[in-house]
Amino acid sequence: MGTLSDLDSLLGCMSRVVAATRHVVQEKVYLHFDNTGYFMGEKMWFTAYVVRADGHRPGVRSRVLYVELLNPGGDVVQRRKLKIDDRGHAHGDLSLDSLYGAGFYEVRAFTRYMSNWGGAACFSRVFPVFRAPSTPGAYEPVIDERSYRRRLPDFREPDTLHRSRLNVSFYPEGGRLVSGLRSRVAFQVSDGGGRHVSADGELLDGEGRVVGRGSSDSTGRGVFTVPASCDGLRFRLRDARGRFKEFPLPESSSEGCVLELPPSLDDSLRFSVRGTASYRDRLLGYMLMNYGRVWSCDTFRVGSGYHKSYLRDSLPEGVNQLTVFDGRGRILCERLFFLFPKPSASDTIRVTSETTRLTPCGKVRLRLHAVPGSVFSFSAMDGGTVFNGRGPSVKSWMLLSSEVKGYIEDVGYYFESDDSVHRRASDLLMLVQGWRRYDWEELSGYRSRNPEKWHPVEDMLYITGHLRSLKKSLPVDGIPIKVYVYSGGSYTDGEMLTDSAGRYAFSLPDVWGEWNLQLKAGVNKLKSRYLVTVDRRFGPPSRRLSPYECRSLPFLPSYLPLLPDTLEFDTLPLLSLSERLHKLPEVDVKAKHRFTEGARAAWATEKRGQYWADVYYDCDEETERYLDEGKEIPLFSDWFMERSEFVDLSHTPFYTGASGEMDSNPLEEAAVETGDMEKSLTSGKEHVEWGRYKGRPIVWILDNEYARGGGKMAIEVPLGERTKGSIAVDLFPLFLDEAKSVYITENPNASVAYHYPPYAEDVVTVFVYTHFSPRRRMEKGVRRTYFQGYNVPSTFEMPDYSLMPPMEDFRRTLYWNPDVRTDEKGEAIIEFYNNSSCREIQISAEGITPDGRCISNE
């Protein structure tokens, strides 16, 4: 029998959870984009909607939003830092003119506060980025033939599932199997590439008898029932080759409870809890939460089986979390379930055209209808150049995708209908991909989080970090830290003492763009024993993408009911691009400039490396990353091998570092070794190899001059006649911070201009660019770096054909407005000009109302 103390404990858990959900309010962000796919060289325009997770209303405390663009290998290639306004809105753009190769790029967005809950709490969407058209306007959806996964190191999170030709993952309803209790188990079947597999399976007991069956659908998901005796069970599947493969089920607990909430076919929702003998007479609790808000809770005894029913209409729509717990706040069983959100006419942005005919470069006037006082973003696209489906909407992201783990294929399907087929599908989705945005055991106090790993809310701009001592005996608390932030003629400074953990924090007024930052620790003679770190690497690790994200999405057209004026499209004269250019007159070169060091630096631009590059590394940013993390700057060769899994310099003459304490001078040791290398290069030695990339010899090009490396020669020539430039071995970067950038290409033609004769084997060319400065070392106890203020959003521009004649115009996004506002009647007028060839316009409008409703034109 339960006691008063049991009841008090359960009520205490409930009270702590209610208080925690009110105090620790999570945030969500959704990005609405101007298009569904892009071409290299374009801009990607977006509006961000940042809301409270408990109701999707504005009111977040964060004022800093981070938006990142990741290449197909998982590297961040572009980052934006945007200011969130009082409505929770921010807008900006990402430039696609400096990418190295087409492919599927990921955009993710998060606040620093969101990173406390990992990558699953952040926004993510994958876009195809196609090759730039060979001629203006000749858009073809072409992605590089070579797979990025084969030519780029993959820095995304490792796959936790050991892949074979057939894989099965099991998800017991409620979280675990319990011996002696019947329960449902969902499963996911996939192949070695992570693609869904439809298959029929059999559940076998320890003696090989069939005790159950289950089939996976087109999503690879299915469910079967485990009998009360669940020890030694195996699930058997037949693979595509007709061979059977068996998979053991997760180990079962000897004691505990199981939860069952099957998809109902009527207007009710029922769940049941069963427990082993030790739990049947105990007083337990259950709690129902909806997006972080406590909706219902109560105590109960399991007995021979506890049953509870609700009317579906009495429960909140969307994703709900049902938790069964004991008096300590420990979860006994838990699951998510999804209730179909009923559509409403007020959720729709209606678009009517006041233009009857679509003409080249002609004006288009639209009238938008939505809830009065709504604010949303709007895009008009050339339908003939849209090569990808629309992907997730603001509604599907806020109500579903943000509450589960992983990518949801065809997420719009779960918002189509509330029939039995869709209910079963959402039930399987919740069982397989359910993610606990709210960790109930943390909320109840059963398990605590390390406060030192907690990221604060950035309600303004901050500079934070910590002081790290290179010897444990040196103190880090109470050390004065001075900060100087300056740009041009503007500056600000401050000073504070570090706390007991060596941490510091400075707040800044709103600043825009990049500023110089200097941090100095007041440690005087001991400054060589301290490093000053900066917090700015708190983004989530790159996640492994689903193969279903890396393909074109199905089209869901939303074209305007406009008829193209065919006659005008065929007969209207247009100025060509060349006719619009103003050519400068030619000038005679009177004298040649002397080749100075500055001219050499100008000549050794990175355009050659950029032209050939498959892979690019920003060494300055890489150096900052090491310093931000409180690490010593590594040797260039050590960094290169760590950075790329394809690089092998282990058996080369590269200097690879000294063992033990760095009391000796590595520069002197490297100089001796460099002298030995130069002797070997000039002694007539047949072949010196300087590392391999994917098993192929590396040719090193330093500041556009041949430096070292290569493969065996196709023909024999004297050593001194082999290179077409000076051998710059002594100038090669020793430490990472001496290099500026690295470009890698597997094209065998890249090194031809630097070396004669051709190689007898395929080589990989690595272009290394330096700062043209003496070898430099960072001063200990002082950090000279940069501070990124808010990025200034660009302004979307379009021609005004009322002031100019029609001309060739190949805009794919005809119009983008991140801030459309309806009047008191709920109306807004949009006007823009068509391009020269668009015959059908596709539109996209999305937003979130102040009361948390997701609105769109879908």
Residue ranges and their predicted role:
Residues 81-84, 212-218, 298-303, 494-499, ...:
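Short beta-strand segments within Ig-like beta-sandwich modules, predominantly Fibronectin type-III
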Residues 22-24, 35, 39, 60, ...:
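Surface-exposed, low-complexity/disordered segments
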